[in-house]
Amino acid sequence: MNAEIVWRPQPRQAEFMRRPEPEALYGGAAGGGKSDALVIEALRQVHIPHYRGLILRKTYPQLSDLVDKSMAYYKRAFPTAQYNATSHVWVFPSGAKIYFGSMQYTKDRTNYQGKAFDFIGFDELTHFEWEEYSYMMSRNRPTGPGTRVYLRATTNPGGVGHGWVKARFITPAPPGTPIVEQFPVRMPDGTEKVLERARVFIPSSVFDNPALLENDPDYLASLASLPEAEKQALLYGSWDSFSGQVFTEWRNDPGHYQDQRWTHVIAPFAIPRHWKIYRGYDFGFSKPFSVGWYAADEEGRLYRIKELYGCTGRPNEGLRIDPVEQARRIREAEQNDPMLKGRTILGVADPAIFDESRGESIAAMMERGPHFLHWVPGDHTRLAGKMQFHYRLAFDGEGRPMFQVFSTCRHFIRTLPNLVYDESNVADIDTRQEDHIYDECRYVLMENPISPPRQTVQPPVGDDPLELHRRARFYRV
């Protein structure tokens, strides 16, 4: 008697499922069979009695599709397996268990405190924040001898976690190439040992799922008919253009760094001594603090010429240094930079640093000697500030915007394009993101407001570094 084949992976699904790295992300575009691969992958060790697996979605209602898939596959593969709809857990003949869970709010991660899972799968990883993902890494540990411990995730571009997911899995290496990170650990005997942990991104698209295209020939046309940004993300898997992106007008074209046309990122140049200089500041302790220096030319165009970003290198994690030390670093940066040394600089900061309700304000601490760093409170009006970004990012007939960024300001270039809208307040950005540079810059823009441009011009199709107006190129693995 021939055994029934419950599920057969497509080639790209098989590539994802055979990867040895402790972390792997699968997806990019829609229709690649991401959720099916995740649900099946969780079954790999159900022959081990003490095995525990966990599949997560951001909210409980979003779990229903995954549970439905498990109903279709698990019962056929293991007829005596039982699903408990109250506790959302499958119990297999060996005693192994696969749980389905959610984490709507970051505080919900404590629901998993003290628990261990050999396998953890995240469906739609960009819906999660870094703090949630990193906490669950600590829950990913063996429940007993003989189990493999690893994390798997699937996602499309976009969502509140787009920035950190892109920085962790997409930017560091080409698809299919292991990203190896080293961690020094001090051992009990005082020696230092360097440990390594690898992760990888496996791209997929609807073209990797011929079974779907055969069953639903119109699905490809449905993706192709989406608005441009959404089509680039869901059809072609673009991480530079996606649904929910706030600043879709942002352009970073190295081919125009020198002539400064049709790009917001430009090559650094010497700042004339008569231009005004501004310094923006957003305080942070456990989250990053951000300082940006800006020059204003005779036409009112602003240039971000330098930045100081207080982060550890991990997503949205601050250096935890006090205001006085931050002031010292800011003053040191100005004294060591020929563009800034000896110049009059107007500092504009988050109004919250002037709060004296709990004692001496942050602004007062920074203004004391020996650093004497003076600030004026910035305009914190959020929607008006966001519109100043749109007004200044617009291109005129000659391809010049009213705001440009030196190519050395890598954290600005990294974070601004990743900002997404708040689903609860669709006119504003989602503040759960790494938005500290955006806030700091907003105070400077509001100090120098401009009127809406009378006419804006779209970049020529030939000047298209993100390939938003042509078929996207596919990564080869």
For the regions a language model picked out, list residue spans one by one.
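ATPase catalytic-site recognition across NTP-hydrolyzing enzymes
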Residues: 208-283
